[in-house]
């Protein structure tokens, strides 16, 4: 009898016998403005804090790779992003509801 994967308490998807977990990723992005501004306005610009929700494809020392869409019966991934680790503030694994 084939071995069945254990049910996880976290939201995930299994593709080709590999489990990918769903995360809420909080990260910082550049904010730009090409208009003229005085010093006070220029110094007041701050990076944008962004939220992305996606499946974690893989991560290494420098990058986190995610996907949001996939082919159910094959290893085809869409809506992909690569986040430099230095930009990621927090990664939260999402519980299954």
What is the meaning of each model-derived region?
Residues 2-97:
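Conserved RNA-binding domains used in RNP assembly and mRNA/RNA metabolism
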């Amino acid at each position: 009898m084939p071995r069945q994967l254990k049910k996880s308490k976290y939201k995930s998807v299994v593709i080709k016998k590999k489990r990918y977990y769903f995360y809420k990723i909080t990260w910082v992005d550049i904010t730009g403005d090409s208009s003229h501004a005085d010093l006070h306005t220029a110094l007041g610009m701050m990076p944008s804090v962004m939220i992305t929700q996606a499946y974690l494809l893989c991560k290494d020392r420098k990058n986190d790779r995610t996907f949001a869409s996939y082919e159910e019966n094959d290893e085809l991934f869409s809506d992909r992003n690569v986040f430099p680790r230095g930009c990621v503030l927090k990664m939260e694994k999402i519980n299954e509801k």
